[in-house]
C-alpha cells in the first residue's frame, strides 16, 4: 500500500487544508473589522437659512490638502476691502467666493464681489470683514468636499 495514499494521511491532509482555509478567511474578516467605521476626512453641516455648508476637516485632511490661510484687510491706497487673489474661487456660473476659516479645521464658503484685481490682490466691494481668516491654498479641495465632486 502506498503510504501517501493511506486513508489516515488523506484525512490528515484534508484537515490541514481546511485549517489553512479557515485561518485565511478569519484573517480577511479581521482586516475588514479593523477599518475605521467613519473614515471621512470631511464632515458637512448645513448653515441654517442658506445653501451653504460648514465643513469640518480632520487634522490629517488639513495636512494632506496643505491648506494655507491669510486675513482680509483694508487696502491703504483705496480704503477697499482686500484679499489675496489666491483666496478667490469662481464657481461654474462665474460667481466669486472665498472660504472663511472661523475656527481651527472649520471652513465656510462666503460670497464676495470682486471690484478689481491689482496684481496678487483682489479688491472687494463686498465680502468678509477685515481681519477674517480666509483660505488661500486648497479652496478648490474644500469646494470639492462641499459638493462631493471628484478632482
Model regions and ranges:
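Exposed loop and linker-edge segments at protein-protein interfaces
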Residues: 121-150
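Short beta-strand/loop micro-motif enriched in small hydrophobics and charged residues
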Residues: 79-117
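C-terminal motif of bacterial Sec signal peptides marking the signal peptidase cleavage site
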Residues: 24-27
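Bacterial N-terminal signal peptides that target proteins for export
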Residues: 3-16
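Bacterial signal peptide processing site
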Residues: 29-32
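Hydrophobic helical h-region of N-terminal Sec-dependent signal peptides
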Residues: 16-22
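Hydrophobic alpha-helix/coiled-coil detector that fires on Leu/Ile/Phe-packed helical surfaces
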Residues: 60-62, 71-79, 100-106, 139
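Post-signal peptide N-terminal segment of mature Sec-exported envelope proteins
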Residues: 36-59
Amino acid at each position: 500500500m502506498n503510504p501517501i495514499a493511506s486513508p489516515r494521511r488523506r484525512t490528515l491532509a484534508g484537515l490541514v487544508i481546511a485549517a489553512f482555509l479557515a485561518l485565511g478567511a478569519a484573517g480577511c474578516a479581521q482586516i475588514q473589522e479593523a477599518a475605521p467605521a467613519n473614515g471621512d476626512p470631511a464632515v458637512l453641516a448645513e448653515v441654517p437659512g442658506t445653501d451653504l455648508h460648514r465643513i469640518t476637516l480632520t487634522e490629517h485632511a488639513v495636512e494632506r490638502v496643505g491648506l494655507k490661510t491669510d486675513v482680509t484687510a483694508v487696502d491703504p491706497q483705496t480704503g477697499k476691502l482686500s484679499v489675496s487673489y489666491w483666496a478667490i474661487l469662481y464657481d461654474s456660473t462665474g460667481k466669486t467666493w472665498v472660504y472663511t476659516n472661523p475656527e481651527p479645521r472649520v471652513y465656510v464658503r462666503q460670497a464676495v464681489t470682486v471690484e478689481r484685481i491689482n496684481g496678487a490682490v483682489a479688491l472687494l466691494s463686498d465680502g468678509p470683514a477685515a481681519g477674517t481668516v480666509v483660505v488661500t491654498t486648497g479652496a478648490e479641495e474644500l469646494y470639492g468636499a462641499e459638493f462631493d465632486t471628484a478632482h
